[in-house]
């Protein structure tokens, strides 16, 4: 793991609210945002916590430095610590830096190849109102990371900084922007030539041959490229500092001002870092787009502005017509005055809506036509379906492939419907949405998120088969392999595991499932049609079995022939509606539990026993011999009727139905009330709309589209939901039925 402080270069741009809003913004991605929490804040929501932090910062008027501390904690690719581990790591790091009592907002991000935590810390103490600045934070963070890796079993990183200052920033630029820095170019192209110079004249000639110039700047030396980019000589190598060179070559000698113009053998340009694929055409397209960016943005803004002006003019024209109509048909001075006021208010509202729409369009245009680095441009092209851009991202040195719990396919691919793409990282990893889970694809293997559901695992198997082939290789923990075997059996996909042990286990479970289904399905045994080769008949060996054996095979204490065509009538229904809790093969239920109709709900059935069913086996209890009218309480599904507790509606469902009926009745009368219904799982985002209490039962209101879903909850959940902002916070329902906010909180 790596913990890094991100300083704000310009003090005037320091803004805790902007930082907190950025780290808690989902950016229209389902799997970008993980757990979000506010620590040492009294507020119940993130926006209120931001206001509380800003108020605390305003109490300190003497501090001149940055009052916000931005910290990033990143983990190795493939590491997925649990939520409790992440919270413990955050707490220990903040305490180690001296910010244990300070207000902070943190968010877990999953939209890159490395799981990471953003922590926005208020440097102003909430009670003392003094500003705290950590002492040697890089050293403290390195020691904390080493201890945390040891305590939580994380993969070890080297926390000794190998690059400092400008050299480290140049390396960051190459990694994140994908553009070659001057420091990196010198090291790769001409560092040996520079170190091999034996005099100042020879050193100046080497500089000219490589399109650079050696100059004195302040108390040191700098290398200046032809485009004006400069770097300190000591940043390139410690033995190229001015004292080191003077000790080796003597006192510094400047280059003669007049030199014959020589053609440089090579020259530094801000070109992309060399990749394993050819990116000449892509980079030419990138440069052309960046050069025409300003013109294209101005043209798009002009079109949007003309469209806004036309809409405003149309609104004013409509308003003038309305006022003219009022002038002609209006009766009475007071009535006309009221109508004129309504017309003016409607015009102002319409113009405000038009201006708001224009502001949104302008923001989107600036975002679309903003200048991007080479790596960001490749990412945008890949998101729009550019296969060459995606291949270039995957060819970068930073792209090292997925690790941890992964699956890969081999063989003949079977293209099919692919799930929606949530994001593409700068390493070329595609993040797919699979229900509540995320599936990552790096072009070679797939990785499933830690909180993957059974549906997510099945979707990963289906995706691997469609994109790579039906021979599946599973790598990871024993638990993950067991989950993939279970998902393969449940999905019934035509795949094969390359690991013989996994494949044998899958075959065993599959055979067990098929055997279990055959025992649940009624056998087709009619009185007629038992000729050779007839459908549903038994093997010849079974036809010569004894009567006792035939009764045992029937499994219900009756001869197989006595079942007659009643088995034929129920064959199709039993195939569609599988009966639950069926015993093992050969086990017969007690007589009082026979003839149940589990596939039918809440139906009173009277059955007249056939002649073949009057004789009972001797092991039947005596109270069954003289059968009279028996109550139907033994039916597996309860019967709703007065005086019995079986089949009663649960209180939560009854309260929800009552509330829905009351709201629907008002809606049908013309009230402006959205449609209400019980909560059902489905696609679409849910927005929290508040809670209600009906007959002592708490209900949660969740809005999906234009419909309000009503869900029964307990009192503890209702109390916790009071901290969620009504109408603003998005929520989701977990597989266990609990409410989870988009910020990661489970209710």
From Swiss-Prot:
Biased composition (Low complexity): 537-562
Record keywords: Conjugation, Plasmid
Stored InterPro entries: Endonuclease_MobA/VirD2 (IPR005094), LPD7 (IPR040677), TraI-like_C (IPR054461), TraI/MobA_relaxases (IPR049751), TraI_M (IPR054462)
Organism domain of life: Bacteria
Key word Metal-binding present: no
Pfam families associated with the record: LPD7 (PF18821), Relaxase (PF03432), TraI-like_C (PF22287), TraI_middle (PF22863)
Biased composition (Basic and acidic residues): 513-526
Stated role: The initiation process of transfer DNA synthesis requires the interaction of at least three plasmid-specific components (TraH, TraI, and TraJ) at the transfer origin resulting in the assembly of a specialized nucleoprotein complex - the relaxosome. Site and strand specific cleavage at the transfer origin is dependent on TraI and TraJ.
Record NCBIfam families: TraI_MobP_relax
Protein name, as recorded: Protein TraI
